[in-house]
Amino acid sequence: MQIKRWFLNNSLRNYQYLLYDKSHAIVIDPLKSDIFAEFIAKNKLQLEAILITHKHGDHIAGVKKLLAIYLNAKVYAYTGNDLFKPDIYVKDGSFINLGFTSFRVMYIPGHIDDHVCFLFEQERALFCGDTLFNAGVGGVQAESADINQLYDSLVKITKLDGDIKPYPAHDYWLGNLDFALSILADDSYFNYYRNQVAELAAEDKPIVNLAEEAKLNIFIRAMSDKALLKALPDYSLGREMFVKLRQLKNNF
């Protein structure tokens, strides 16, 4: 299946994603229903599934309108709320075969306690919501957020094949790289990508695979990068370094 990406240019800098082939469509975390409906109608597709990574408002606001148009579409989510009820409740390890494609579910709490991601192995794509961003990770401001769970979830993601491409829900490239450079100012990867993306529109920013993400993401590098021991000598690599970096990023 092909993957269509839109940038909404809103205050939260949301990306929106749709997977499609000649007949079928799958929507991920719809905020604006109209962009999906227009594309689906133009290409004469059938919306088969709506996948929800977590129940924050900017990931579910468009669900109700899409279901009013596409009566046969099924919602897949870990849990629901007042705005939507899943047709299929998913959990860690759930495998869903839609016939025209399939995906596996990973439970990755931390940003919020109901967070999952969707791994499309045939497409080599991971829709990771607000857990992993380009050069960063999700925040822990929600009531059910847990920084230690976020670390464990990140470790889980890093164990996937390196050629899989993560598709995050927001464009936070520049802010994340600026933070990383505030810790490791001379790092070649951080500087290279900062220069690469500085002049690019959000629609044109690169989609890198997990192997490359591991090099440009300071939170992944917190697991093993000895350069961080020089920058933050009071903290050991792994969970302790990750927690410290996430705390510093909160106030950056």
Curated annotation (Swiss-Prot):
Pfam families membership: HAGH_C, Lactamase_B
Keyword match Hydrolase: yes
Disulfide bonds: none
Subunit and partners: Monomer.
Protein name from the UniProt record: Hydroxyacylglutathione hydrolase
Database matches in InterPro entries: Clx_II_MBL, Glyoxalase_II_hydrolase, HAGH_C, Hydroxyacylglutathione_Hdrlase, Metallo-B-lactamas, RibonucZ/Hydroxyglut_hydro
Superkingdom field: Bacteria
SUPFAM superfamilies in the cross-refs: Metallo-hydrolase/oxidoreductase
